[in-house]
């Protein structure tokens, strides 16, 4: 496929990139578990998530049209940003003169195709001390904007122990001869768009369905330092047996999330 495709009219392809990012920790006591949830809830509140999504919008070359954000009680946050490929012209008479405005289906159609969303899900196990934080991000674009440009930035913006990534292209556009194009760029794997340092840091598994333009990559952090997973304590506070038991439990938790199955 050539680098510069000559298209007939607007590029109607929709590209969607979805992330599930997990941060895992061990908090021994109920007080430590509550403190972890409060800490992660404050660290990734709606205000900070909004800034991260604004950065994503800038990275992929889009423009912010509207922002909706919310912090939830007792914990959790969500942000949705409506984006456009081209910045709205504030001097365009359509935007400054009184009028009925766009039809609802126009606005909703745009929202369905070009938006960035994030939701957070803190969680803890009441008995074994394991706490997890899941963050879901969706970047969906139409036109010439590619959400793949945001891959590395998003992975490094969070404490990403496990990352599940899905990328798909839907719809079709046409070249100047009227021939349908169901994808407008070369891709064999999401890994094609990851930086080398990211590839070195993670164990990765692909499940791709090329004929359907669906690409799936799972990522598990290779480096394991127990101190990075202890909340409210350090390895020096533990006996050898305690440290080994906690490490085994953490590794099991991470593998179960990575493979999406219980390993009992």
Curated annotation (Swiss-Prot):
InterPro entries: AdoMetDC_fam_prok, S-AdoMet_deCO2ase_bac, S-AdoMet_deCO2ase_core. The modification Pyruvic acid (Ser) is found at residue 114. Is synthesized initially as an inactive proenzyme. Formation of the active enzyme involves a self-maturation process in which the active site pyruvoyl group is generated from an internal serine residue via an autocatalytic post-translational modification. Two non-identical subunits are generated from the proenzyme in this reaction, and the pyruvate is formed at the N-terminus of the alpha chain, which is derived from the carboxyl end of the proenzyme. It is an enzyme of class 4 (lyase). It comes from the Bacteria. GO terms for biological process: spermidine biosynthetic process. Its EC number is 4.1.1.50. Keywords: Autocatalytic cleavage, Decarboxylase, Lyase, Polyamine biosynthesis, Pyruvate, S-adenosyl-L-methionine, Schiff base, Spermidine biosynthesis, Zymogen. This is S-adenosylmethionine decarboxylase proenzyme. It comes from Chromohalobacter salexigens (strain ATCC BAA-138 / DSM 3043 / CIP 106854 / NCIMB 13768 / 1H11).
